[in-house]
């Protein structure tokens, strides 16, 4: 969990130039005086991680408590919260160890610290991959519930949802382990970038299609009640704003991290790219912010879940 300059060691393999990628012959520190580096204090990392940790623990506990929330949809939401919880937990653990090592309050051999760092890297990477997968799974689940409403309960059954969840976790752990082991291969980084783009396109296509169907439905209702066109336009505008916020937050929080991976492959030692690499901590902080925002978008909008959350907070088990 060593820190190189201002860069934390978490997923530190991403901060170094992969040896398998051709070099461009430029020094990595040739970023120029114009380069802007956003410093993220360890205290801020710790605070963001703790907020996300508590928030997602509450989501998992709430869904576990109420049997009415044990449907496939809430299973996916629970697993998303668990993934975000692991991302935050890994961040909190690493930041705490870094602070203890720097303060001299924790003494450990370099080999032990390296092994601990590798474990945290695998946990964090696998939880990030699973988080993206569950965001996609939630989009697919909602799409089926709208376009195949009559067959939804026969298509999305609890056993199928559990098998899908198990497959996502196994694949996430497997691929994250391979990624950490072979991070110095450009193909591995490109696979991660392609995976992110695939999830982004999947979510965009499904949610845009759902918005179009909702607008058609609202237009049909307006015609039945002989209402004017502005009602439909207002509904469509509201839906478009909601969709923009949902996809915008996803892209803004995850996009910079995968841009970082892309630039490692395309221009590992170009001054402009090197400047972007210096903000790796900021990109990680944005992902943790996404872990804080996810429950607000996918979980706490449910009235049943909010009611159960109040019971959890008042310890009325």
From Swiss-Prot:
Lipid bilayer topology: Multi-pass membrane protein
GO annotation (BP), single: adenylate cyclase-activating G protein-coupled receptor signaling pathway
Record localization: Cell membrane
The keyword Transmembrane is assigned to this record: yes
InterPro entries in the record: GPCR_Rhodpsn, GPCR_Rhodpsn_7TM, Melcrt_ACTH_rcpt, MSH_rcpt
Parts of the chain that traverse the membrane: 38-63, 73-93, 119-140, 164-183, 192-211, 241-266, 280-300
Lipid attachment site numbers (S-palmitoyl cysteine): 315
Top-rank taxon: Eukaryota
Cellular compartments per GO CC: plasma membrane
Position of the signal peptide: none
Keywords: Cell membrane, G-protein coupled receptor, Glycoprotein, Lipoprotein, Membrane, Palmitate, Receptor, Transducer, Transmembrane, Transmembrane helix
Residues in compartment: Cytoplasmic: 64-72, 141-163, 212-240, 301-317
GO molecular function: melanocyte-stimulating hormone receptor activity
Glycosylation sites: 29
Extracellular side: 1-37, 94-118, 184-191, 267-279
Family: Belongs to the G-protein coupled receptor 1 family.
Assembly and oligomerization: Interacts with MGRN1, but does not undergo MGRN1-mediated ubiquitination; this interaction competes with GNAS-binding and thus inhibits agonist-induced cAMP production. Interacts with OPN3; the interaction results in a decrease in MC1R-mediated cAMP signaling and ultimately a decrease in melanin production in melanocytes.
Function comment: Receptor for MSH (alpha, beta and gamma) and ACTH. The activity of this receptor is mediated by G proteins which activate adenylate cyclase. Mediates melanogenesis, the production of eumelanin (black/brown) and phaeomelanin (red/yellow), via regulation of cAMP signaling in melanocytes.
Protein name, entry field: Melanocyte-stimulating hormone receptor
Species name: Pongo pygmaeus (Bornean orangutan)
Annotated gene: MC1R
